[in-house]
């Protein structure tokens, strides 16, 4: 698969394939289909090439023919159950082609989104797809676009519309509801004229319960793509609007209309969307962008569980970040995310309030406190957390938004890095063996207590030497309660 393939390269590949199949049974029967044709027509870069062959078993036969005639790079991989095959082109080894026969589908089991498939016509293949804009075919031999469902007109008019009757489309496969949300959000971010066809939107609402049979992994996959689009807020709003959020992350529904305190100008859901919007708009240079966006979406998920109102009628959410971290784990495990992903998002949510008391210009921050955060985060995670904190700060009411805080944290951090007093990669120069030797104690809680004391000394002075630390440890009185 090629990411961001230029139109010029795409046409070179199409012409290459055209010359190969000229005079064979595949001539006039082989089409590029789906997103590549849509993006070609919309003058966008193309991400992958999917091919359909309008012949029985055409996909596998075409792939095998390519291999037998020396046109593939590496081996062809076939999936006979689904009639599909995958291979890389010899002339363009970085390009992966997925090919399949044109198919028609029957959904006989209402509790499954896996249809029975068999060979079908080009029109039947188009009608089995979800959206008209994804149901376009480019004939490789003639270079003509075949449009069975009005997709070209829908692109011109910026319309997201299903290929046939919405109720049938979504009854057959509820995942199409989430795909529709994703495509709308993606294109609406680029051009606000994009909209969902009225009947298509009604069908999404009417058949939203079909999401109940979709596997959590597929839901998570669509959620990831929504979060990583240019306007994830559009997708999240639409999920709530059509009732789909209760099948994706139902806990988020509890934020809608949740009254907040004077520090906020929106309800908890509006605030969450503002934070997500700011995170999505910010340039990101790390590897954990999805984790940060997920943390933005879930950072206040604990608020409904800890809400309290004092005797003056003021609303409080004490400890919501701690409650939220526990709920984050429940949500992400349910959606089958990896342990590493869960731990990253949990950490960000649990610590997003960490700097609130430092003040707008960090006037209440101590160097040792900043170093402790650096040490506990590590370099990459530190700046991921600051991204979330900055978005959260700036989404508060104007008088409480701490607009300069993260800028000042970065300024102090840069100073520490310059004079080698930061603690991103700090390693304590003593260990448990050193402590046991100098104190004459055995392994246990006392050793841990001494090492924690040593870390406190290091937070104050990261250049402290092993000799100095051991001198302090030798004179350190271990509390009796810790023995």
Question: What is each PLM-predicted segment?
Answer:
Residues 1-483:
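Catalytic cores of the polymerase beta-like nucleotidyltransferase superfamily
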